[in-house]
Amino acid sequence: MGIFSIANQHIRFAVKLATAIVLALFVGFHFQLETPRWAVLTAAIVAAGPAFAAGGEPYSGAIRYRGFLRIIGTFIGCIAGLVIIIAMIRAPLLMILVCCIWAGFCTWISSLVRIENSYAWGLAGYTALIIVITIQPEPLLTPQFAVERCSEIVIGIVCAIMADLLFSPRSIKQEVDRELESLLVAQYQLMQLCIKHGDGEVVDKAWGDLVRRTTALQGMRSNLNMESSRWARANRRLKAINTLSLTLITQSCETYLIQNTRPELITDTFREFFDTPVETAQDVHKQLKRLRRVIAWTGERETPVTIYSWVAAATRYQLLKRGVISNTKINATEEEILQGEPEVKVESAERHHAMVNFWRTTLSCILGTLFWLWTGWTSGSGAMVMIAVVTSLAMRLPNPRMVAIDFIYGTLAALPLGLLYFLVIIPNTQQSMLLLCISLAVLGFFLGIEVQKRRLGSMGALASTINIIVLDNPMTFHFSQFLDSALGQIVGCVLAFTVILLVRDKSRDRTGRVLLNQFVSAAVSAMTTNVARRKENHLPALYQQLFLLMNKFPGDLPKFRLALTMIIAHQRLRDAPIPINEDLSAFHRQMRRTADHVISARSDDKRRRYFGQLLEELEIYQEKLRIWQAPPQVTEPVHRLAGMLHKYQHALTDS
């Protein structure tokens, strides 16, 4: 496909984006808004953002959800801006500096919350800065400006949503149904690989792919939940399926690890059974029916616990899968499965990374302020706004540098494109609203196609072009003002990019170590006799951390294996019949405190000391288990955990 070719699947969204822009433009001028540009810009960003992220037309609900987040972020930013102005109106420089810190604070929060919700906090940060900078000539008009800005943004969001509904957005439901079928087959094939106990790298690749696919299915569940309330039952089932899928991965990998030391546990009966190849979900269904009969015949005691648990989880998965596909009423059996253990939320391992993002945003905004005050440039304020926008939005993404480059390319492309509209097209459409709408629709259509291709600079070009062409009421054509705005955007993006390069993010290794220590803490916390604590579902949180580890350290198999081993240890110890007595309970609390100290230690020396203390406590704990005559189901997992921690103590403690 050529660089300028138009694929059929890209046309519908391009028309949708053009419609959103035209609607916002028409409504903005019809209601005599002072700056309809904000409504048009909002409609374009809300519609195009999800398409750029998805690499195609976004699924139903994505644009509505992004619009909802934009409204929340705008209102938070407007309120913060008003509070800052009221408190510091007599000290303008201090007011701007506090706004820079506010933008950094919002970026810090957006780095810690869920990626889906971080957009609202990023927006809140630079909205306050925009308000404070814009009202500098006339501070008494602050409330009016804040209200107008909120109104224009809400109009833009409503127009984007109307355009989305008008062109029947894609439903993700069919994709979810297909993935559920395919995922079950992949789970069965992983168990086959683990029982064969073949090449470790093949197994690593298989379970790594399944972790990614399960995480992707969880993202599809979020999209389905946003799409319509009629999928509420399917959403509940999919939430439980996420845990079941992770359980299947864990049991399969434990089956593989068990055979490293005790291959005789997997009998020839099960080896022969899992030799049968499967291609479809129907094949898996037949095999599971046969497998349940084999287990009933051999007995639970003669069946390896990992295979028994795997079959139970796969059976529940099948039952819930049928419910998701049909979206029927939840029956009593399903309700029993759905009334599972409460999920545990873990503390973010990226606090240092979030602090780096705070300083990047704050310093870049302060640098923009100094540049503005030093040069006295009329478009210094525009440069500051772009600095805040780039840093606030770039910091929450995995590769901030590439986002900044995208904005630089976009603002550079916007200069000639905006020049064409400013000098030729818009002046010649002054007498006709229809011609003005058509001209902007053409812009939205072609940039909408490029956005779906994820062309570098396409998203920045769309926003920057709309921002610099004259869409005010009334329209005024001052070339110097246009040139200042265009150059201000470019300078702001370059300054933001410079700060991102200078303030290096070296938090990757620290984040990896914190993640590994959180896995250790989770395994240690599973050693408890507290009934409520044993019922807590840590599995989704643990695999979410594993997924983050896989993204931070692609290809680092030793780290992945260590993390997976800790997850397996957690699951095994969680179900182990630990003797109930006060002596062991007190020691469990002591070990949990020590594990928490390992995570929170600021220096390597403290971390090594606490880790050594944890290893000593595990030795004492094993002796206590022997004294209290704990069964092998308890002593063996604890012994394996202690051995793993001894083996990898340097990786878990050194920076």
Curated annotation (Swiss-Prot):
One of its GO terms (biological process) is carboxylic acid transport. GO terms for cellular component: plasma membrane. GO terms for molecular function: transmembrane transporter activity. Keywords: Cell inner membrane, Cell membrane, Membrane, Transmembrane, Transmembrane helix, Transport. It is a multi-pass membrane protein. InterPro entries: PHBA_efflux_AaeB/fusaric-R (IPR006726), PHBA_efflux_pump_AaeB (IPR023706). It comes from the Bacteria. It is found in: Cell inner membrane. Induction: Positively coregulated with aaeA and aaeX by AaeR. The keyword Protein biosynthesis does not apply. Its main location: membrane. The chain crosses the membrane at residues 13-33, 38-58, 69-89, 93-113, 121-141, 152-172, 370-390, 407-427, 431-451, 459-479, 482-502. Belongs to the aromatic acid exporter ArAE (TC 2.A.85) family. NCBIfam families: PRK10631.1. Forms an efflux pump with AaeA. Could function as a metabolic relief valve, allowing to eliminate certain compounds when they accumulate to high levels in the cell. This is p-hydroxybenzoic acid efflux pump subunit AaeB. It comes from Escherichia coli O81 (strain ED1a).
